[in-house]
Regions:
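A conserved mid-domain beta-alpha-beta active-site/ligand-binding segment of alpha/beta enzyme cores
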Residues: 171-180, 187-205
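Catalytic core of membrane glycerolipid acyltransferases/transacylases, capturing the structured
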Residues: 16-78
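A short, well-structured juxtamembrane/interface segment
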Residues: 1-20
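A cross-family acyltransferase "interaction/gating" segment
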Residues: 16, 111-183, 219
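Residue-level preference for the first positions of well-ordered beta-strands
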Residues: 21-23, 97-101, 137
Length: 227
């Protein structure tokens, strides 16, 4: 699908660790852009688990493919967040990489900038780091151009770019982690999630050659809000 519809240029893949667990936090502008980090990781010889809504596993043909490449079904219902986070942490602490889309769904920002994100990515990164006793590498992957692929006709192929950024440092948020108790402090998970969104916005601005708007799009209010 990706090769038929697009010409992908990716940079920064040298940052992908050859071994061990790591987290890729990817942008979600369109349904097509989920394939870009998948293919990129495949060519790097890594096979992450992918957190994706459970309904995708039931899609004709492509659902079976998602399962084969490492899809981790997510039941997106109230009360399931803790179970999803625990499954993700277990994937990482077992030594496997994980890819997540922190926006939770295709962005609703009319201009396609990163919107509000669920702090589960922060919880997963911090808790897995605490259990492993070291900071789990976390990378932002930003794809742009896939939104122009809006039909199944493969020609003309669209240009798609992806930047796989350097590891995002969050060592300061792990200070005192041995005293957290049973749960990651919400303020720390929120802060790490904010850093991911801000960094994604910076990368997106560089790719697009534009200045990002003030604030970010809030999914709950469907409006732009200040940081």
């Amino acid at each position: 699908v990706l090769r038929n519809h697009s010409k992908v240029k990716a940079w920064g893949l040298e940052h992908v660790p050859e071994t061990g667990p790591f987290i890729t936090a990817a942008r979600h502008v369109t349904m097509y852009d989920v394939f870009v980090p998948m293919v990129s990781m495949f060519h790097q010889g890594r096979r992450p688990r992918y957190m994706a809504k459970a309904e995708m596993a039931k899609w004709p043909l492509i659902g079976k493919w998602f399962q084969l490449v490492g899809m981790q079904p997510v039941q997106r219902r109230a009360g399931k967040a803790k179970a999803i986070e625990e499954t993700s942490v277990e994937i990482l602490t077992s030594g496997r990489p994980l890819t997540v889309w922190p926006e939770g769904t295709v962005t609703r920002d009319p201009q396609k900038w990163p919107m509000s994100m669920k702090n589960g990515v922060g919880v997963i990164a911090l808790e897995s780091s605490r259990r492993l006793g070291c900071q789990v590498p976390l990378y932002c992957a930003v794809t742009w151009g896939a939104a122009s692929i809006n039909h199944w006709w493969p020609w003309p192929r669209k240009n798609v770019v992806m930047c796989y950024d350097e590891a995002l440092d969050y060592a300061d948020l792990l200070d005192g982690c041995d005293s957290w108790g049973d749960e990651v402090p919400t303020d720390r998970a929120d802060e790490l999630t904010r850093r991911i969104r801000v960094r994604m916005t910076e990368i997106m601005a560089e790719i697009r050659g534009e200045q990002a708007p003030d604030g970010y799009w809030d999914y709950r209010t469907m409006s732009r809000v200040k940081d």
